Amino acid sequence: MVRVKICGITRPEDAATADEAGTDAVGCVVEVPVSTPRKVSAEHANEVFSVVSPFVSRVAVLMDNLEPIDRLEEATAVQLHGTEDPETCEELSELGLDVIKTFWVDQRGSVWLGEELIGDEVLAEYCEIVDAVLLDTKSAEGGGSGERHDWDASARLVRRLDVPVILAGGLNPENVREAVEKVRPYAVDTSSGVEKEPGIKDPEAIAEFVRATKSV
């Protein structure tokens, strides 16, 4: 069964709602160097993470700033959303954290690490180290844009890569079933797709997203 991650959570009550709906992971965007209504401090992320059950993964999303790591006592995983190199991924893995590395897919199906177009050799190097890769839509916002990318390209990557692939980018309750059927990812990730306003989740949308994903 495909797993679900609800990301960009800013309130403990939204994390509790996601947990009750049957999500497998919750994510907080922690002290990233971009302007987003979903950004929280490490201390606030700990508060959010503390309300979910022990079997729910608690993912801290970081972006070229690892300083918060020592203050994220409640996190069980990190999602590296910047240009972090394989050595950094390995260092975090040695701390006992699950490591997810984000890559971006553009509308032509090309894969990017930040502003660098990358090929299979670079992807393979990361895949030897990380626990999963996340495919998001390439955009100026660095994620959370609500835009989907080429799912056919993502499906090819799922078949090619030797690690679990998490699909993100423009997913919502209305299209996630189609995305799962086409891409066959290990998990799906949504943030803006289940919000009633930026940074504030919609309980009904979360529940429907989980139901639609797990019905496939």
Curated annotation (Swiss-Prot):
GO molecular function, one term: phosphoribosylanthranilate isomerase activity
Catalytic reactions on record: N-(5-phospho-beta-D-ribosyl)anthranilate = 1-(2-carboxyphenylamino)-1-deoxy-D-ribulose 5-phosphate
Gene from which the chain derives: trpF
The protein's name in its UniProt record: N-(5'-phosphoribosyl)anthranilate isomerase
UniProt cross-references to PANTHER family, sorted A to Z: N-(5'-PHOSPHORIBOSYL)ANTHRANILATE ISOMERASE
SUPFAM superfamilies: Ribulose-phoshate binding barrel
Alphabetized Gene3D superfamilies for the sequence: Aldolase class I
The organism of origin for this protein: Methanopyrus kandleri (strain AV19 / DSM 6324 / JCM 9639 / NBRC 100938)
Assigned protein family: Belongs to the TrpF family.
UniProt KW keywords: Amino-acid biosynthesis, Aromatic amino acid biosynthesis, Isomerase, Tryptophan biosynthesis
Principal EC category: isomerase
One Pfam family it belongs to: PRAI
Functional pathway: Amino-acid biosynthesis; L-tryptophan biosynthesis; L-tryptophan from chorismate: step 3/5
One example of a Gene Ontology biological process annotation: L-tryptophan biosynthetic process
EC number, UniProt record: 5.3.1.24
